[in-house]
Amino acid sequence: MAELACFCYPHLENDSYKFIPFNSLAIKCMLTAKVDKKDQDKFYNSIIYGIAPPPQFKKRYNTNDNSRGMNYETSMFNKVAVLICEALNSIKVTQSDVANVLSKVVSVRHLENLVLRRENHQDVLFHSRDLLLKSVLIAIGHSKEIETTATAEGGEIVFQNAAFTMWKLTYLEHELMPILDQNFVEYKITVNEDKPLSESHIKELIAELRWQYNKFAVITHGKGHYRVVKYSSVANHADRVYATFKSNSKNGGMIEFNLLDQRIIWQNWYAFTSSMKQGNTLETCKKLLFQKMKRESNPFKGLSTDRKMDEVSQIGI
């Protein structure tokens, strides 16, 4: 995750702003600079290489002292920064909006995936600039639309029906912020269209998840799509979701946290997010993740007989 101010800076033109991507040498200069505390939140002028991000964001970049940040000297950093600028320059950002826009925390990996989709000549985003920019504006939280299959970050499609598409996320192969744990496995499920779904299509998805992904929990980050994650990573997701929810609540103007379909979501996660929305503490909410829940009656009669027992997947073992 990183603020948009880590990728670009605003330049006032008439009554709105044009956004310009940082170059890696300007960032490198900022990372070595001594800056007064009162100037930590201001864009840094490297004199030689142009404007650099505010020094308060130093930890967002990979250095000898911090291996958890972005690999800003890669070509992918420049591609992501340029893509963000293209999207921001396609809309009007006024002086009253600019600080709020640049403070938005975004998923670096999501944006890298959109670059990869853009470069794939078989992908619809390669052929449609409007759809590409729409996808980026959704990714950076500047649109109230949800991420659907067409505007999704992408990955490897492992399941699809008339209503849903399930993607295996490819973060292990990333340049900018790769996942270093080689055991990482995670999926995302997007709706093909933002409209009411038929019961039969929901039933197909639940059957697929129950039999092929029975070692995983289905959760949501509240943005209109599902995530399918290892049970061992659920607590980590809970910390991130709670922190983001609280931050958005504090800053105001947040998009409503979408609990999604209770029949698809893991029961304990639904309890966690419901408790979070009620304003309870992180400790209180997280207790629900490890509490034994009363099993719900099967919402779809006959679902358990859709697959034979010998078809149960070994994925995740």
From Swiss-Prot:
Keyword Flavoprotein: no
Predominant location: host cell
Cofactor(s) needed by this chain: Mg(2+)
Keyword terms of this UniProt record: ATP-binding, Host cytoplasm, Hydrolase, Magnesium, Metal-binding, Nucleotide-binding, RNA-binding
UniProt-listed SUPFAM superfamilies: Rotavirus NSP2 fragment, C-terminal domain, Rotavirus NSP2 fragment, N-terminal domain
GO molecular function, one term: RNA binding
Subcellular location field: Host cytoplasm
GO cellular component terms, A-Z: host cell cytoplasm
Active site location: H225
Keyword presence, Metal-binding: yes
Residues engaged in binding ATP: S107, V108, R109, K188, H221, G222, K223, R227
EC number, UniProt record: 3.6.4.-
BP terms from Gene Ontology: viral genome replication
RNA-binding as annotated region, ranges: 205-241
Family, similarity comment: Belongs to the rotavirus NSP2 family.
Subunit structure: Homooctamer. Interacts with VP1; this interaction is weak. Interacts with NSP5; this interaction leads to up-regulation of NSP5 phosphorylation and formation of viral factories. Interacts with host DCP1A, DCP1B, DDX6, EDC4 and EIF2S1/eIF2-alpha; these interactions are probably part of the sequestration of some host SGs and PBs proteins in viral factories.
Protein function: Participates in replication and packaging of the viral genome. Plays a crucial role, together with NSP5, in the formation of virus factories (viroplasms), which are large inclusions in the host cytoplasm where replication intermediates are assembled and viral RNA replication takes place. Displays ssRNA binding, NTPase, RNA triphosphatase (RTPase) and ATP-independent helix-unwinding activities. The unwinding activity may prepare and organize plus-strand RNAs for packaging and replication by removing interfering secondary structures.
Name this protein carries in UniProt: Non-structural protein 2
Organism of provenance: Rotavirus A (isolate RVA/Human/Belgium/B4106/2000/G3P11[14])
